[in-house]
């Protein structure tokens, strides 16, 4: 069986490397995706990636994917998007939620997630390494 993971990055993550590097780090999204692509390839897993600032594009990608696992950093949509939640529940694909920063150590409005209670797991506060942790967990589950 061919294993596939869909990596979803939400709004403003295209600015990684220059947006608040003290919070989000110095790596660009392209750097992170390249690293994850290598990790996936080494494990014999296909990695599909989308980043968008538009909620509907992320929803369409969720609806269209044939991946068996999703890793999502919904960014600001974490706290606002019932639509993303419904899309994830609608396709019934297990997912991990990732955040670069520790959202629980930040402003109170960032403490609530519309996705966390449905995620396999939530990884936050480890910077770009959080994606690596999520992908390793996804690969382990896919190959179990």
From Swiss-Prot:
Q: Keywords in UniProt for this one?
A: Amino-acid biosynthesis, Aromatic amino acid biosynthesis, Lyase
Q: What class of enzyme is it?
A: lyase
Which reaction is the catalytic activity of this chain?
A: 3-dehydroquinate = 3-dehydroshikimate + H2O
- The UniProt record gives the binding positions of substrate as 73, 79, 86, 100-101, 110
Q: What is this protein called?
A: 3-dehydroquinate dehydratase
Q: Name one GO biological process term.
A: aromatic amino acid family biosynthetic process
How is this protein organized at the quaternary level? Answer: Homododecamer.
Organism lineage reads as: Bacteria, Pseudomonadati, Pseudomonadota, Gammaproteobacteria, Alteromonadales
Per the record, the pathway is: Metabolic intermediate biosynthesis; chorismate biosynthesis; chorismate from D-erythrose 4-phosphate and phosphoenolpyruvate: step 3/7
